[in-house]
Design a protein with these regions (language model features):
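N-terminal nucleotide-binding beta1-loop-alpha1 segment
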Residues: 1-5
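Short, hinge-like loop/turn segments at secondary-structure boundaries
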Residues: 54-55, 78-79, 101-106
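Short beta->alpha junction loops
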Residues: 35-45
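Mid-chain, well-packed structural core segment of small domains
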Residues: 58-93
Length: 133
């Protein structure tokens, strides 16, 4: 599940987020045979609805800027039984001070950030190796 502005990957600030769009990233990888469903929304409530209605074995969540501001998304992650790994493309600890704290991190089972789109690969590897998804 990708949050706000991640629909602009490949176009938005490529020095921070890279020059590859998410659809291109998905098409270029087979993800070790793991079945993936992809969802992106710029709307907080839609992200919450997707978290609450998911029947997935695991969720990779990049809430974008909502990671730093949305108590509602944080509470949704805490409320569901599906394990969630929080990812960020950029190294949020090395960016502006307001990006240093994630409200989601304390309720996710883990956090991966700063490795570009490889952050998603690392989250998938974690779930495959630890949850046998």
């Amino acid at each position: 599940i990708n949050g706000p502005n991640l629909n602009l990957l490949g176009k938005r600030n490529p020095t921070v987020y890279g020059d590859v769009g998410f659809d291109e990233y998905l098409a270029a990888n087979n993800f070790a045979g793991v079945e993936l469903d992809y969802y992106q929304s710029n709307v907080e409530g839609e992200i919450i609805n997707m978290l609450q209605s998911s029947d997935a074995d695991a969720i990779i969540l990049n809430a974008g800027g909502y990671a730093h501001t949305s108590v509602a998304i944080r509470d949704a992650v805490e409320a569901i039984s599906v394990p969630v790994v929080e990812v960020h493309i950029s190294n949020i600890a090395a960016r502006e001070a307001f990006r240093h704290e994630s409200l989601i991190s304390p309720v996710a089972i883990g956090c991966i950030f700063g490795f570009g789109l490889k952050s998603y690969d690392l989250a998938i590897d974690y779930f495959v190796n630890h949850f046998k998804v």
